[in-house]
Amino acid sequence: MNTFTRAALTVLVGLVIWFLPHTEAIKPEGWHLLAIFTATIVGFILRPWPTGIMALFGIVAAVATNSITMVQALGGYAEANVWLIVAAVFFSRGIINSGLGKRIAYTLIHSFGTSSLKLAYALACTDLIISPATPSNTARGGGIIFPIVQNISLAFDSEPNGSTARRIGAYLMTTAHTINTITVTIFLTACSGNLLITSLGAKLFGYDISWWEWFQAGVIPGVICMILMPWFIYKIYPPEIKETPQAAAMAQKELDILGPITKAEISVAIIFVLCILLWSTAIWTKLHPTVVAMMGVLACVVTGSLTWEDILGERTGWDILIWMGTLVGMAGLLGKLGVVAVFADFVSQHLVGIDWFWASFIISATFVYSQYFFASGTARITALFSAFAAILVAMGAPIPFTILLFGLMNSPGCTLTHYSSGVTPIFFGAGYVPQGTWWRVGLAISVVSFLIHFWGGTLGMWLFGIL
């Protein structure tokens, strides 16, 4: 479809909902905002223009039609969680600038990369180590992990789009991508989608998920998947090359190019560790996670690892600020106007007789496998989280469990297609894995991942007293 067609369909969806009859329980301004919000989501999916532009269209339409005031429209930009992810994106630029991410990866490869399976685990450890401070898994996967995987593959004469792709490149690309979608489960600050979920949850239910609560829910399924998935993929989609003795020499060559560890790397590493400590101890220090992230950014600037020009040029952070602020603001207003509650009550009345826990399993599976219809995890969260979460809460599910459950379910669907998340096209686009194989292997991975995340996450929440 061309731009005009996609834009026309977006507007059409909004107009249809606008003029549909609705229950008197929903005020006219609430229904009109629902129409505009839905059209904005459709715009995110169809993308006649970039996501940020579609968000601005949503704000303008809502204010111009007197559905909300200008002050209400801009209220989402004052949300702390929105600024948390923006600050964390800026901080991740300091990690990339310093070269710390590359050094960690090549050090692990040099130490443990004697086989293709061990190489996969070394890459997994790299992603895990840097994920708490890189909330853009696209930047983490595409900017740090992918170039390393590509270099390793080519070093073993594994070329894309040819007979040598299966030597090692196909396996490493598949595994690195899978791990990138798993680390987002463990840390709240490892993915923008996580913070979108917690922001929407806070707006809808008035409950703020802490960094520590997220870690408690995600650590068990996340660690299990981190350990299992490289081996599982090794079994269902094995590389032709099993032993990689020359990987250590290649990694040493890259480390020689990087040279001795720099002051910038040392300072970023110290700041990184301190931020994690402050995030994980916020229950005692009472420091807001956003303040901690901003402290990290300022510390990087003071130590010279980051400049104001770097911050101004970090397009991902500013883009997230625009679209996420809009969504969080609109979603909160839909909750205040009673739209979400009416929808949740209607659906829950038709699910009489089903226990909320088993309903959560069914809705979780629906949420995960709806990813086939979305070109990003963010679009899926935006479209489905508020409604699905409200249904579960209306059926009796605890609010913290509900919010965290959808956080856990953000991961399994990201392996399903070659367009499931922002980072997916980078790994798929390398040309090592055919589309049909990507979908087939990705489905197998997602089934295992879904079961582990649901049951492991439930166990974690029970053990730590959340459930």
Which residues are covered by each model-predicted region?
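Generic alpha-helical transmembrane segments of integral inner-membrane proteins
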Residues: 8-16, 38-42, 60, 64, ...
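Hydrophobic alpha-helical transmembrane segments
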Residues: 7-8, 33-34, 38, 52-56, ...
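Transmembrane alpha-helix interface/packing and boundary motifs in multi-pass membrane proteins
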Residues: 41-50, 126-136, 177-188, 278-284, ...
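Membrane-embedded alpha-helical segments and adjacent helix-loop junctions characteristic
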Residues: 22, 52-162, 314, 318-320, ...
